[in-house]
């Protein structure tokens, strides 16, 4: 599936911020751009039709995901495809660079942890 231009541009911003964390590599997951730590994906461009264009999928536990969606539903959401997966979908245009950095840090810690609680 070809990425939309907005998704590529948004991921360039994500990559610029996210690669500042220790051990981060740029790769792909399911053919889309992703950031990984220790070989584990912590964020990617979601391609399932339940994800809106210009979104980012970030791994985190279910509790934190639900808190974010409740606090800022115009920024964070989930789709049917992602409901049972420990991640949140974020509308990149709604995030400042500081918010994006904090969000990526959450995903980075989640993926890097040896044991994950969900």
Each language-model region and where it sits:
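Charge-dense, helix-prone N-terminal extensions
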Residues: 1-118
């Amino acid at each position: 599936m070809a990425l939309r231009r907005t998704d590529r541009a948004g991921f360039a911003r994500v990559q610029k911020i996210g690669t500042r964390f220790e051990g981060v590599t740029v790769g792909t997951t399911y053919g889309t751009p992703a950031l990984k730590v220790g070989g584990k994906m912590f964020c990617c461009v979601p391609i399932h039709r339940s994800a809106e264009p210009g979104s980012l999928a970030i791994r985190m536990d279910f509790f934190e995901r639900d808190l974010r969606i409740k606090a800022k539903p115009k920024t964070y959401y989930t789709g049917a495809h992602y409901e049972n997966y420990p991640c949140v979908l974020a509308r990149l245009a709604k995030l400042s660079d500081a918010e994006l950095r904090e969000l990526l840090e959450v995903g980075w810690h989640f993926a890097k942890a040896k044991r994950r609680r969900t």
